[in-house]
A protein has these predicted regions:
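Juxta-kinase regulatory segment immediately upstream of eukaryotic protein kinase catalytic domains
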Residues: 2-39
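ATP-binding pocket architecture of kinase catalytic cores
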Residues: 43-200
Length: 201
């Protein structure tokens, strides 16, 4: 995986001691069996609905051949066109959907301690695959192939159907935005928060 080469911003994860703090946090909350965490490659992906999405290859310096993996770090943006942002809500949705037929990554840990990376973030497993950019999809080979394009459409509709089967009332961030009814408590009383920092449960 190539490293990101864009000019880093002031609060970029690659600047200062942000990576060192993140490495310590990953060891404590995601990879507790490791002696330490060392980054071997990292790149910020495009898209992400304004959230920062980083692919990170990590290894244990004490046993790099046996202990290495790739994780995804999603961090809240400073600002964006669809505020407010809440990456911890996103993690709750992922958790709720994980047992359904909707393909989502497994949440490994969450953190809203701003002393780690400056903003709340979550860590998920890496799922191999390709997410076509809707802005350029018509130029992709699979789009020009009628059979493959039909397959993409069927896959999309299949996932959409699985999403429709999910009971939205069990997805806390979604249920919390619905207007309270006579037989349902208000969003404020229904809403609960995960621990400040820690592994997924």
């Amino acid at each position: 995986m190539p490293s990101a080469t864009a000019t880093p911003r002031r609060d970029d994860l690659r600047l200062g001691d942000s990576l060192q703090r993140l490495a310590l946090w990953l060891r404590d909350h995601v990879l507790p069996a490791w002696d330490g965490v060392r980054f071997t490659a990292m790149a910020r992906t495009s898209g992400g609905v304004s959230y920062e999405t980083w692919l990170m290859d990590v290894e244990d310096p004490a046993a790099p051949a046996e202990r290495h993996t790739r994780v995804v770090v999603r961090r809240e943006p400073l600002r964006g066109p669809v505020e407010p942002y809440d990456v911890l809500d996103e993690a709750e949705v992922y958790r709720a959907l994980h047992s359904s037929g909707v393909p989502v990554p497994r949440v490994l840990a969450t953190c809203d301690d701003r002393s780690v990376t400056g903003r709340p973030f979550i860590v998920t497993e890496f799922v191999e695959g390709d997410v076509p950019d809707y802005r350029t999809i018509q130029r992709r080979p699979e789009w020009r192939d009628e059979r493959r394009r039909a397959g993409m459409a069927r896959e999309f509709l299949s996932v959409l159907a699985e999403l429709q089967r999910v009971d939205w009332r069990r997805v806390v961030p979604v249920a919390a935005t619905a207007p309270p009814g006579p037989r349902r408590p208000s969003a404020r009383s229904r809403r609960t928060r995960r621990p400040t920092c820690g592994p997924s449960r």
